[in-house]
Design a protein with these regions (language model features):
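Positively charged n-region of N-terminal signal peptides that target proteins for export
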Residues: 1-5
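Cleavable N-terminal signal peptides
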Residues: 7-8, 18-19
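Intrinsically disordered, low-complexity regulatory regions of eukaryotic regulatory proteins
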Residues: 20-21, 218
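Transmembrane beta-barrel domains of Gram-negative outer membranes and organellar outer membranes
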Residues: 21-154, 161-165, 170-181, 185-189, ...
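A contiguous binding-surface segment within folded domains or other stable secondary-structure elements
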Residues: 194-227
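Membrane-helix boundary/juxtamembrane motif in polytopic membrane proteins
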Residues: 196-198, 232-236
Length: 299
């Protein structure tokens, strides 16, 4: 009789034992499966140098970005080798979420006010469902408040506006090497002559070569399609070579460039100085990140 009871109890508990084993195997399977791991810090700043990078502020973070360009180095002692002349741009840029950033700023050249939205729908990742690149989309609008030389000109506000659209595609090939392609479309509502195109296309390429945990060499070049057709002074493709220094929440960039302008319609379509002629400017960027809204720790 006791043997029969033991047999019945064993048979009754057998499905429960099998179910527990299945649950344990399922938990182990989830732990063993590779996870999708995002690749961070393709660039250390939201800019390569002039151009926006694929990076954006994390949700709740605010960046103060200051960009400055001096005059021509070869201007001589009379203009103190470019220090007497300068252009600058100051902006505030906020992370709405980890994939959406907005920003607004003011540039001294042509007295531009600008605002932009940057969206990062695709992020480079490793592991399960790995992605080879990070893709960010940028839309920017700007308007000039400058006075035109002829007081008789009546320039409506719509004609003072310019726009820029960019598809930023970057890959971090190694901890010390990152590259970015930046197809760019620029539209200017008002141009110098009817022969000048309102809309122009440019292709940018940029890179970052890391030397130490806090220093890197950066480079950026833009090829402007049909620049030879623009009237006025000859245009040159902007080339910029810089050196980055990271100090905690600050990133400091110092560089040489043939472009005096800072916003896209300026440095891409209006660069009239050449590296071959040694017409170079010293510039620097400073970014400072503040955490405005702290994220809640997930339990």
């Amino acid at each position: 009789m006791p043997r029969i009871v033991i047999l019945i109890v064993t048979l009754a508990l057998l499905p429960l034992r099998v179910a527990c084993q299945d649950d344990l195997l399922e938990m182990l399977d989830k732990e063993i499966k590779p996870k999708r791991i995002p690749v961070d810090a393709t660039f250390k700043s939201t800019r390569v140098i002039n151009c926006h990078s694929v990076e954006r502020m994390q949700g709740g973070d605010l960046e103060l970005h200051v960009a400055h360009r001096f005059g021509l180095l070869n201007s001589g002692f009379k203009q103190f080798y470019g220090l007497d002349e300068s252009s600058s741009h100051v902006s505030l840029e906020a992370g709405i979420t980890d994939w959406l950033e907005i920003g607004a700023g003011r540039a001294t050249v042509d007295q531009y006010f600008n605002g932009f939205v940057k969206l990062s729908p695709i992020r480079q990742s490793k592991g399960k469902w790995a992605m080879p690149v990070t893709v960010s989309l940028l839309g920017e609008a700007m308007t000039t408040t400058k006075d035109y030389p002829d007081p008789s000109w009546v320039v409506d506000s719509i004609h003072r506006r310019s726009f820029c659209w960019q598809v930023l595609v970057a890959r971090k090939f190694a901890p010390w090497l990152s590259l970015q392609l930046s197809p760019t479309w620029i539209h200017r509502n008002m141009v110098a002559t009817p022969q000048d195109a309102n809309r122009m296309f440019a292709l940018g390429v940029g890179g970052r070569l890391k030397f130490t945990p806090r220093t890197a060499l950066t480079c950026e070049y833009f090829w402007l399609k049909d620049r030879e057709l623009l009237t006025g002074a000859p245009r040159y493709n902007p080339l910029t070579i810089g050196f980055d220094i990271e100090t905690g929440s600050h990133v400091f960039q110092i560089f040489l460039t043939n472009s005096f302008n800072i916003l896209e319609p300026g440095y891409i379509t209006e660069t009239t100085r050449s590296w071959k002629k040694k017409e170079l400017h010293v510039g620097f960027n400073i970014s400072r990140v503040f955490t405005v809204i702290k994220k809640k720790n997930k339990k």
